[in-house]
Amino acid sequence: MPVIHSYIVAYDSGFAPNPFNGFCTLATCKPDIRKRASLGDWIVGTGSNRQGVRRGGFLVHAMRVREALTFVEYWNDPRFEKKKPNLHGSYRMACGDNIYCPLEGGGWRQLNSYHSGEDGTAVQKHISRDTSVDRVLISDDFVYFGAEGPKIPDVLRDAGLVLSGRGRKKVEEPASIANFETWLEGLGVKGYQGRPFDMVEAARKRK
């Protein structure tokens, strides 16, 4: 029986998860979810309520886990070549999450990415945390709303789908999962539907 792993997307940049190029992928951050989620489970990200965002209780994304790859498999898979970041390209190219290139002697080279320093240097803290769980979650059955998602109904909030702080909530009650799937299906859309919050803010500041 599938379960729901719910968490708050503290920084909705399009990096974790990355909803571009036909797949929603979770390759960085959230090692606990990447470790524990099984194929068929749902991963649900809800909005942050921090100052300047105020999207608490709104759906950012929902992805059904279809595949789980190692970092080496993810790096070498041609389907995910476009998820290797290019910070000098478009916004979508810049927030690529395929950032760990395996080294011959072991270890990883971290591509210049959202987990690198401002000068492009590798950040060991992120390398250690990201690669502590050698598992990248892949979904082609997802919806991503970013900053423009619907409010989650009270019946699902009451079931524990929306957290009040950091961490992960595991929803296992079959009726709650069925209610969530019915609601999600009723939205009538799939795939990439809206821009990440940070992308919206960047566009607003350029005006």
Regions found by a protein language model. Give the residues of each.
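Compositionally biased, charged N-terminal/linker segments
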Residues: M1-S38, G194, M199, K205-K207
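Residues that flank catalytic or metal-binding motifs in active/ligand-binding sites
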Residues: V3, L59-H61, D140
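Short loop/turn segments at secondary-structure transitions that flank enzyme active sites
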Residues: D12-F15, N49, R66-F71, P150
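Short coil-to-beta transition motif at edge beta-strands of beta-rich domains
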Residues: R34-R50
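Short consensus segments that form the blades of beta-propeller domains
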Residues: Q51-R55
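Short beta-strand-centered aromatic/proline hotspots
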Residues: G57-A68
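Contiguous surface segments at macromolecular interaction interfaces
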Residues: F71-K207
